[in-house]
Amino acid sequence: MAGLGVTELLIILAIVIVLFGASRIGDLGGAMGRGIREFRRGVRDEDATAPTDASKNESK
């Protein structure tokens, strides 16, 4: 993982907690999770509504 060990990751995590605070990190994580969920839902809906190549050829 790009040469990062456990110690380096813990140091980075500690710096992030100091900069943003624990509650802010939870809010950011929740917002990121909601964004990813909405993106996946949008991709899935787009795939369901998009006609396939086979159905395009049958209608011609």
From Swiss-Prot:
Give the family per the record. Belongs to the TatA/E family.
Q: List, alphabetically, the GO terms of the cellular component aspect.
A: TAT protein transport complex
Broad class of where this protein is predominantly found: membrane
Q: Which UniProt keywords apply?
A: Cell membrane, Membrane, Protein transport, Translocation, Transmembrane, Transmembrane helix, Transport
A GO MF label: protein transmembrane transporter activity
State the organism named in the record.
Herpetosiphon aurantiacus (strain ATCC 23779 / DSM 785 / 114-95)
Q: What is this protein called?
A: Sec-independent protein translocase protein TatA
InterPro entries in alphabetical order: TatA/B/E, TatA/E
Record-level GO BP terms: protein transport by the Tat complex
* Function comment: Part of the twin-arginine translocation (Tat) system that transports large folded proteins containing a characteristic twin-arginine motif in their signal peptide across membranes. TatA could form the protein-conducting channel of the Tat system.
Membrane association type = Single-pass membrane protein
Entry-linked HAMAP family: TatA_E (MF_00236)
- Where is the protein found, in the record's own terms? Cell membrane
